[in-house]
């Protein structure tokens, strides 16, 4: 079955003879939905088309989830199967079951080229429990489904930071590898944090201060970046840590988000990596939704809310970004949903596409990239969210570690 052709530490579709085989494919098609159950953005569904096209000679059983228990959009996979059929150009059969008799009968009766989508895997209570790979392999879902399939492929990078049943459990008992989405995510992000050409610049923003500081610490400690340019709320935290009086309104916002303790953490990073961390020289204040430029030196206790980086900072940052060979962007530079305060984010995006290798970490900045129509100008736009952040922060992702363990297991078997 195996024909290992990769020098990487995980298997891909190319390493398997898939013809006539039954493939269990874990994808991430979790999508925003309206109150009538209509999918509002099908980007994640479309992202898996390349994987499915490369599996046309096999029988494909799709495992996926939608939302989580308690949420209004926690619903069936029927609309996802419908859209997937449209984009794939062939029938994707929705199966109202996960591992019961009906699901197993449907799998057993499949022919080459067939694609079925099982029910929302989170309808099963054990799915979302965080447990070891061995423990997940000992669950009913794995025991019931594994005998009916030949190969497991994880194409759900966005949930691979969770040690969930359908993400890691099957890797213990089946030959396992990465789908095309997972493969591209791992190769691109690895290049972004380790093997990209220099100079390498990370531009971190948004409102998730702890995430940005985790990434900053990792890439500067391990040499993954030459410079980290801070924007957004994390820049405000770092400015406060550096001794700047950013104003009561901005400090109150930081406290309201639970990030007051991150000021001390930022202070430590600035002391350790002072010349490698870029801070704004000026900012844009929100005066009744009007943009007012202000140098850092003029900020005081009565300062208005900071909603963007200033014009001088935009010039400095974009010059540095344009001269970089590798650029990683995560999080907007300001309150980009308000037009006057989207300037910093938009200019940074436009500068990043001029680098040799550019990555968007996902989240709100991806929305702005799409708004500018520049998606195809980036080397990679991550679908990962929290998984992407954890990867950039140097943390091990259970789903990825499970694929590495499966690779090692079948490499050892090959030697026998």
From Swiss-Prot:
Primary subcellular site in the record, as a coarse category: cytoplasm
GO terms of biological process kind: gluconeogenesis; glycolytic process
Binding site for ATP: 337, 362-365
Keyword entries, A-Z: ATP-binding, Cytoplasm, Glycolysis, Kinase, Nucleotide-binding, Transferase
Any one Gene Ontology cellular component term annotated for this protein: cytosol
Intracellular or extracellular location(s): Cytoplasm
Record-linked SUPFAM superfamilies: Phosphoglycerate kinase
Gene Ontology MF term list: ADP binding; ATP binding; phosphoglycerate kinase activity
Pathway listed: Carbohydrate degradation; glycolysis; pyruvate from D-glyceraldehyde 3-phosphate: step 2/5
Xref: InterPro entries: Phosphoglycerate_kinase, Phosphoglycerate_kinase_N, Phosphoglycerate_kinase_sf
Substrates-to-products reaction catalysed: (2R)-3-phosphoglycerate + ATP = (2R)-3-phospho-glyceroyl phosphate + ADP
EC number(s) recorded for this UniProt protein: 2.7.2.3
Binding-site residues, substrate: 28-30, 44, 65-68, 122, 162
Subunit structure: Monomer.
Family: Belongs to the phosphoglycerate kinase family.
PANTHER family to which the protein is assigned, alphabetical: PHOSPHOGLYCERATE KINASE (PTHR11406), PHOSPHOGLYCERATE KINASE 1, CHLOROPLASTIC-RELATED (PTHR11406:SF23)
Protein name according to UniProt: Phosphoglycerate kinase
Source species of the chain: Methanosarcina mazei (strain ATCC BAA-159 / DSM 3647 / Goe1 / Go1 / JCM 11833 / OCM 88) (Methanosarcina frisia)
């Amino acid at each position: 079955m195996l024909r290992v052709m990769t020098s990487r530490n995980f298997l891909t579709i190319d390493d398997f003879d898939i013809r006539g085989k039954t493939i269990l494919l874990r994808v991430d098609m979790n999508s925003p939905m309206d109150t009538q159950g209509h999918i509002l953005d099908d980007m994640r569904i479309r992202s898996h088309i390349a994987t499915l096209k490369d599996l046309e000679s096999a029988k494909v059983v799709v495992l996926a989830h939608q939302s989580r228990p308690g949420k209004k959009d926690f619903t069936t996979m029927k609309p996802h199967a419908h859209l997937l059929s449209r984009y794939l150009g062939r029938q994707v059969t929705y199966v109202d079951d996960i591992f019961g008799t009906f699901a197993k009968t449907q799998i057993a009766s499949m022919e080459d080229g067939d694609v079925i989508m099982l029910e929302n895997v989170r309808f099963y209570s054990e799915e979302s429990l965080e447990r070891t790979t061995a423990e997940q392999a000992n669950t009913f879902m794995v025991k019931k489904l594994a005998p009916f399939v030949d190969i497991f492929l994880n194409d759900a990078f966005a949930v691979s930071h969770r040690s969930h049943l359908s993400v890691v459990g099957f890797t213990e008992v089946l030959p396992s590898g990465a789908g095309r989405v997972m493969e591209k995510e791992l190769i691109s992000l690895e290049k972004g944090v380790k093997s990209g050409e220099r100079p390498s610049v990370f531009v971190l923003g948004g409102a998730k201060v702890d995430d940005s500081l985790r990434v900053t610490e990792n890439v500067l400690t391990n040499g993954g970046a030459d410079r980290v340019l801070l924007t957004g709320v994390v820049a405000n935290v770092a400015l406060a840590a550096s001794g700047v009086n950013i104003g009561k309104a901005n400090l109150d916002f930081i406290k309201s988000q639970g990030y007051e303790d991150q000021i001390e953490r930022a202070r430590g990073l600035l002391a350790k990596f002072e010349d490698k961390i870029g801070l704004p020289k000026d900012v844009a204040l929100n005066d009744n939704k009007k943009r007012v430029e202000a140098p850092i030196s003029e900020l005081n206790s009565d300062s208005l809310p900071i909603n963007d980086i200033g014009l001088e900072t935009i010039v400095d940052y974009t010059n540095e970004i344009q001269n970089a060979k590798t650029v990683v962007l995560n999080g907007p530079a300001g309150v980009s949903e308000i037009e006057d305060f989207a300037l910093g984010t938009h200019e940074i995006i436009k500068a990043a596409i001029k680098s040799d290798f550019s990555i968007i970490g996902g989240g709100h900045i991806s929305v702005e990239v799409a708004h500018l129509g520049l998606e195809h100008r980036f080397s990679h736009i991550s679908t990962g969210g929290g998984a992407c952040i954890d990867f950039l922060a140097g943390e091990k992702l259970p789903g990825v570690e499970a694929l590495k363990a499966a690779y090692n297991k079948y490499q050892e078997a090959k030697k026998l």
